[in-house]
Amino acid sequence: MNERSLRVLEYNKIIHMLEDKCTSSLGREKLKELKPISNFEQITTWQKETSEAQSILIHRGNIPLGGIHDVSQYLRRTEIGSYLDPGQLLQLKETLAAARRMKTFLKDDKKESTYPIIQELGNNISSLKHIEDKIELCIISETELSDNASPELRNIRRQISSKNDAIRNKLNSIITSASNQKYLQDPIITMRQDRYVVPVKQEHRGNIPGLIHDQSSSGATIFVEPMAVVELNNQLKELRLKEQVEIERILMEIAAMIAERSDDIKSNQIILKELDFIFAKGKLSVEMRAVEPVLNTNKKISIKNGRHPLLPSNKVVPNTMWLGEDFHTLVITGPNTGGKTVTLKTLGLLTLMAQSGLHVPADYGTKLAIFDQVFADIGDEQSIEQSLSTFSSHMTNIVNIMDNVTEQSLVLFDELGAGTDPTEGAALAMAILNSLREMGTVTVATTHYSELKQYALSTEGVENASVEFDVNTLSPTYKLLIGVPGKSNAFEISRKLGLSDFLIQRSKELLTREDIQFEDLLQNIEKNRSTAEKEKDEAARLRMETQKLREEYYEKKQQLQTQKEKLISDAKREAYKIVKQAKLDADEIVENLKTLRAELEEKEMNKKIEEARKNLSDQMGKLAENMGEKLVLKTNKKPPKNLKIGESVNILSLNQIGYVILPEDANGEVQLQVGIMKVNMHVSNLERIKEEKDTKKTGVGKIVKSKAENIKMEIDVRGQNLEEAMLNVDKYLDDAYIAGLTHVTIIHGVGTGVLSAGLKQMLKKHKHTKSFREGEYGEGGMGVTIVHLK
């Protein structure tokens, strides 16, 4: 596409607007490749993907495309056997997570068949959750690995911590010793060259034996490693070296996992770049209230209420324009600042946007043609260095256009033939337009020349147009009128501004008779058009009022019908309620009668049951007396003692369970309840039943146990904003408190420090917080906060 045309039509500003819509550097990199093309099939595909993105944004809102990083260099490092530092691994994890979220987001779409292009991209994303989880397990922050990265690392760090404590204890005994106080500059322990030292006064350097590692800038203090801790420091150094070796081993292990799936990660990155770019186009379409144009290759243009995309939406005047059917050349005339150039630029820029796969700010049904080139000669771009006049500058560009134009091109001229003698300029303009017309090229030109108005009126395939001007307010309306030649309005504007009628009349006398007749004709045409336009608007208004009255009538009629149906429905419902209540009352009376009858029958039945129970009890008592010897044949060598009322016992001779209702009497017998019977048994025939304690936990204890089993000792809020993190931490602290945890860890990372500071402010006031501190070495350092709960 012609670079000069892209520049004068301000295509680069559209690219800048798209850049703001991208969420990653990958999408912005893709934008650099975007240029208008003339391949119909490719443009159609681009337009369809923009429409899919627009539809998803409208129906589902924001897209989970955050957290994408360019990890190409990281992948190359793993492929050659190198490892990545923790910060780089975190970026790679975020990119993998973004790809997985996007895949899930697109997979969850209920209308996925409506978005075949974007859905196919989503289906091709590889989910690499195992790599995400490995990095999550091992990396605490941009600079530190977790103790959980490996058992060996945890063990080494435990030894380092123990060794640190031993060194500090030894040094504390030295600096707190009364005999050493006078030799020390300060009673503190510090570090020099990764070794623990104490500050000793220069003049007492020999009083504390040890290795000198550094001195102060003034020379008054030397930093000595006492001999008592040299060996401990050496052991600590060895442990730190072992720690570093283990860290590198873990990082190499992760790098090997990444290298193994390097191709999948590269493919994901390409897809994420494409999706970011596509959704940037969709966001721009939504913002501009743009539509997908109907494309064609037969040079037909029909823009419905097109708006210049770079003008404020509350100020731009929509315009309708068409050409390519009955005419291929459009000549636009009218006063300066009337909007002719904006109209020209709107057509050119909308064409470039459409051929770049972008939607255009216009109404549905807008049709645009695909051109092999868009040529534009707009504005005064004369070269001072080349000493070119306005006319020469324009003519140089026009010569270039005429040398390269084809019948499939779009040509835009602003003030064609201006900058030279009007007669010669008009003649040149007509010759250029005629040459392009004969070639079949779609051409739009703006001009002041009356000769070009007459040329358009008298030449087949050429049409006049103008921008409307309100003489009463001396301001343009910016409305394009196709088929109506423009009028300069010089005399009317001059009169309104105060020029005397005498001078205006003298000016008219200097015009030729043909010029006067032509201007009068244009004035009559404009007057008739304006009248017709007003009558058309009035007719449309009356038609709308009639339609509104008709709709109100039908609405009233519908309301009355609805009210009528509601009254009938309410009456039926009320009648049904009365009948239903009457039935319920009747049923209640019947039930009461049945209950009364049942109560009478139950009393009679209970009386008979009681008589039967009494007879059975009497017979069992007699049986027990007559067969007492047989009942006690089976005895307990250790009869139970001190049986209490309510205790359960096993009756050995009957193999039945009974409950004590009367304690042991002088004869050693107790009275038992066995089922419905009461029997007397000797204690030697009884065996005490040991009751099992109910150890089942219920109620609050069970809930707390469940909480304690489910609540982790740490919460990770990295990547969350402060408000989201505070909500999650607050809920987590509640759960941890209920679960009975004594302390927990909040992982927030280092970053800018905003998240850490905000959470610490919250912890100061939290009801469950007893105390909190930053993590120590091996716990996560500044990237974590340890909270002790009340």
From Swiss-Prot:
Q: Which Gene3D superfamilies match?
A: 3.30.1370.110, P-loop containing nucleotide triphosphate hydrolases
Record Pfam families: MSSS, MutS_V, Smr
Q: Which GO terms describe its biological process?
A: mismatch repair; negative regulation of DNA recombination; rescue of stalled ribosome
SUPFAM superfamilies in UniProt: DNA repair protein MutS, domain III, P-loop containing nucleoside triphosphate hydrolases, SMR domain-like
The enzyme's main class, written as a single word, is hydrolase
The answer on whether this UniProt entry bears the keyword Hydrolase reads yes
Domain (Smr): residue spans on this chain: 715-790
- GO MF annotations for this entry? ATP binding; ATP hydrolysis activity; ATP-dependent DNA damage sensor activity; endonuclease activity; mismatched DNA binding; ribosomal large subunit binding; rRNA binding
Which controlled-vocabulary keywords does the entry list?
Answer: ATP-binding, DNA-binding, Endonuclease, Hydrolase, Nuclease, Nucleotide-binding, RNA-binding, rRNA-binding
Membrane spanning residue stretches: none
Q: Where does ATP bind?
A: 334-341
EC number of the protein: 3.1.-.-, 3.6.4.-
Which family is annotated? Belongs to the DNA mismatch repair MutS family. MutS2 subfamily.
HAMAP family documented for this protein? MutS2
Q: How does it assemble?
A: Homodimer. Binds to stalled ribosomes, contacting rRNA.
Function summary: Endonuclease that is involved in the suppression of homologous recombination and thus may have a key role in the control of bacterial genetic diversity.
Q: What is this protein called?
A: Endonuclease MutS2
